[in-house]
Swiss-Prot record:
Organism per entry: Shewanella sp. (strain MR-4)
Subcellular location(s) of the protein: Cell inner membrane
UniProt domain RCK C-terminal: residue ranges: 405-486
InterPro entries documented for this protein: Cation/H_exchanger_TM (IPR006153), FAD-bd_PCMH-like_sf (IPR036318), Na+/solute_symporter_sf (IPR038770), NhaP2 (IPR023729), RCK_C (IPR006037), RCK_C_sf (IPR036721), Transptr-assoc_dom (IPR005170)
Membrane topology qualifier: Multi-pass membrane protein
Gene Ontology CC annotations of this record: plasma membrane
Protein name (record): K(+)/H(+) antiporter NhaP2
Keyword tags: Antiport, Cell inner membrane, Cell membrane, Ion transport, Membrane, Potassium, Potassium transport, Transmembrane, Transmembrane helix, Transport
Amino acid sequence: MDADSINSFFLIGALLAAVSVLLSPVSSRLGIPILLIFLAVGILAGEDGPGGILFDDYSTAYLVSNLALAIILLDGGMRTRVASFRVALWPALSLATFGVAITTSITGVMAAWLFDLHWLQGLLVGAIVGSTDAAAVFSLLKGRSLNERVGATLEIESGSNDPMAVFLTVTLIAILGNVDAELSASFMLISFIKQFGLGIFLGLGGGWLLWKLVNLSKLAEGLYSILVLSGGLMIYAASNKLGGSGILSIYLVGLFLGNKPTRGRHSILNVLDGMTWVSQIGMFLVLGLLLTPSDLLDIWLPGLALAFGMILFARPLAVWLSLLPFKSFSSRDRWFISWVGLRGAVPIILAVFPMMAGLPGAQLYFNLAFFVVLVSLLVQGASLTTAARLAKVELPPKPLPISRSGVEIYPSSEWEVFVYRLSENKWCIGEPLKRLSMPDGTRIAAVFRHNTLLHPSGSTCLEAGDILCVLGQEKSLEALSNLFSQAPETKEVPRFFGDFFIDTEVKLLDLAPIYGLELDEATGDMTVADLVAAELGSHPVLGDQFLWQSLHWVVAGLYEGKVTNVGIRLPAEA
């Protein structure tokens, strides 16, 4: 490649990336996933589009996609709170293993019938499209205030179900590539254990070593993110090299680092945020360039049947069967999880495996994977907001600071500065600072008024439009935001939790005459907390609800995992 070709490559690449970024606001206006915009730009620039760029280098696409996916998973792991595992780990693992196997089997049978394939070839198609995609799930759920049990289950599933899909895909390719090979139970069991076992061991072990290395190093601030990124990629590659799941490993590395006091954590997250956007744009641009839309015309009708069969039948059946042991999921939760079986880059990456292995019919597998991904993003991704509203799993948005930044005085420092702008309707307007009930361990460090810095004292009175810089830790964020911030306006806020709020220490006997409750010996001595535990189990989450004696009871407040208050909706409002 000469200098002119290199410059042309840079020019075209930068132009496509810039166009993708500038078109990103269109996704919110049209209600379609932003990843679809990036993919569309790549397709339009490709062989069948106005750009006319001929790109058929599957090895390069495989390299770019794996690198991008690794970065996305590292960032996603660092932003996942380990506390969410309390309510979502086992359901997510059930979906990541049994769910993928069930989806693969049903989709494989449909593919074999629709495309007149051998049953093993059909199963290979099912394995390729059998797992949800972490990049798509993290991107579309980011910033949404979902029921914690549902949101965490979807995120953990998407970060941990790829080993099962890779295991099934690689196994079936080995069998189809060797006519003498057999489906040995011991061979499959060993491969399965290697994928998950090595992935978990290297992810957690490597994450611990990388965490120690980061905290012991004294580097320029900008170098910590490079150390984390390079270390994560080393663990990802080592896991893949040894036969484990690199995808699972790097997700666990991010999870470990994100939930430990890590030096430079905030600057690392800021850099990774930008890297994740670059990765998403680059990955979907390259995959879009790789696709020749005219190749999909021959398979569009059976392809639609396969995609909708997976969306409407295979995925829901897999979810309902996988979640049977977990009674805490309501029917609405299960339907929403079924609908958010988003496919994205991973199926396309897996579809490259048969191409690189030289299997007969590999182009069909690739085209089918691409077709299923397009339908999934268009149908499931575009309807995500509507589905969340209908399933009632989206919570009213929480009040948050307008910005937050770390105060990394010590390697293990968890101090942050939260910035709030006071609106006119906050009760603290006109009140002196000494009368505010601030959470323990927090302090107002500065007050800005009309672009002027004030030196706050106990007698300083707050005014509308004041900007407050508050020093505190993440554990105090909810209390501080409720005190100073303003949640985004939405019509659903007043109705979601109900019009009446009850402290969980109140006895049902005291509520009986007010709400017409009929109590017996078993319920007469119960408190509201006892009722919630009896109906929802030991791990309720915000927004959980149940129907009892014609009233809708909604978990409206939690503190350290304990329900503090409950909202009540009357029958006419439910």
